[in-house]
Curated annotation (Swiss-Prot):
This is Large ribosomal subunit protein uL16. PANTHER family: 50S/60S RIBOSOMAL PROTEIN L16, LARGE RIBOSOMAL SUBUNIT PROTEIN UL16M. Part of the 50S ribosomal subunit. GO terms for molecular function: rRNA binding; structural constituent of ribosome; tRNA binding. It comes from Buchnera aphidicola subsp. Schizaphis graminum (strain Sg). PROSITE patterns: RIBOSOMAL_L16_1, RIBOSOMAL_L16_2.
Length: 136
């Protein structure tokens, strides 16, 4: 699963997830899966959606993952009293704003990529839509 190799600090503040997305255009492939909602994608969810796409297109075409989980989420163990410091890092998330391109695909037909992204979207906790590259 995806996670940073090294970070400057082990733990992070919760923070807020406001604003609009950077990376809102299809850059590498012809088709993309675009986020409509804001939310958090865990490394497991990103990997699960990637597997759904690759299983459907069966080694043809190319896929780009445009999100990376770089925020650590901590949890304290069950039945532990309040206080005594921040919990341990349990998993990593990517913060998603509306408009962010999550996945891109090239080398397959539009119908196949639509169906593959539909399968991937079922694995994700946010609403998404299918987009194509804008050619000027």
């Amino acid at each position: 699963m995806l996670q940073p190799k090294r970070t400057k600090f082990r733990k992070m503040h919760k923070g807020r997830n406001r604003g609009l997305a950077f990376g809102a255009n299809v850059s590498f492939g012809l088709f993309g899966l675009k986020a409509i909602d804001r939310g958090r994608l865990t490394a497991r969810q990103i990997e699960s959606a990637r597997r759904a796409i690759t299983r459907y297109i069966k080694r043809q075409g190319k896929i780009w993952i445009r999100v990376f989980p770089d925020k650590p989420i901590t949890q304290k163990p069950l039945e532990v009293r309040m206080g005594k410091g921040k919990g341990n890092v349990e998993y990593w998330v990517a913060l998603i704003q509306p408009g962010k391109i999550l996945y891109e695909m090239d080398g397959v037909s539009e119908e196949e990529s639509r169906e593959a992204f539909k399968l991937a979207a079922a694995k994700l906790p946010i609403k998404t839509t299918f987009v194509t590259k804008m050619v000027m």
